[in-house]
Amino acid sequence: MRSPEKVLNSLSEHSKCSDYRFERLYRVLYNADMFLLAYNNIQSKPGNMTAGSDGNTIDGMSLKRIEKLIGALKNESYQPNPARRTYIPKKNGKLRPLGIPSFDDKLVQEVIRMMLEAMYEEYFENTSHGFRPRRSCHTALIQVQKNFTATKWFVEGDIEGFFDNINHDVLIGILKERIADERFIRLIRKFLKAGYIEDWVFHKTYSGTPQGGIISPILANIYLDKLDKYMKEYAEKFDKGIKRKMNPEYKRYSGKIWWLGTKLKKTENEVTRKELITAIRCIQKKRLIPSVDEMDENYKRIKYVRYADDFIIGVIGSKADSETIKEDIKNFLYDKLKLTLSEEKTLITHG
């Protein structure tokens, strides 16, 4: 068996080819070293000592337990346990449901997560910042500050109940575009369908990713990568012009300053020089306006950044352009991803 590092590096190298389809992934789950690495990754994280629906925690870990788990994976008798549902308070005072998987399921999910991250990290767009290595809400804000200069309108996107409404069939279809291993796909589907236990009652799951599941964030990014790529193509079609034309007022003031400056260089009379300097400073104050025409219809741009299920679009264009963009995104999300853009919470604001 190859070391986990070599396995993951190999997957990462292949991911750089956008049309590559991964095969024989399921065999990676026979590698005990992958599970040991997974164990090391999750053992110190808060919450992993919390018992799942099977009552076990990571302190009961052993190589024998890993071998038993691999055996169940080999003959595909492995079945994830339903997560134990609990509730945690949100900032607004409401409660958010959280599923606590069994530890064996955490272990398998962590192996899958490492594999998916290696396969997709290079494939993701630079505009995606949530749940990714070396990225955070801070890198998203930095990108907004850097790229959204001169933006006139903002479209703040809100997807209704995103994590609960991820369509399983759509997600599996997206995964199959890059993964040609049916057993690996079946395993992920098992996690999607595992359900949860609340008040000792089992509930099936028909949509959404495993709540509290280790693979949920990466699956969410794979799902919304479709939106990221759609917006990249949309911007390429929308963007117009090389640069904005100069503001006529700014140009006129600049001309006056140049003319007065030329006179100043030729004048030796101190009184006249002082008058010219005063006039130049006065015009310089008037010239504290945008140097370009902000209403230039021949120059348009879109900038887009996403963090998890929140996204923002900066528009250099008209309000009508922003409304069209919002409507196009709404239709794309519904038609392609079976998601609903919140009319109430998706705002268009002036910059």
Predicted regions: what is each one?
Residues 1-351:
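Non-catalytic terminal/accessory segments
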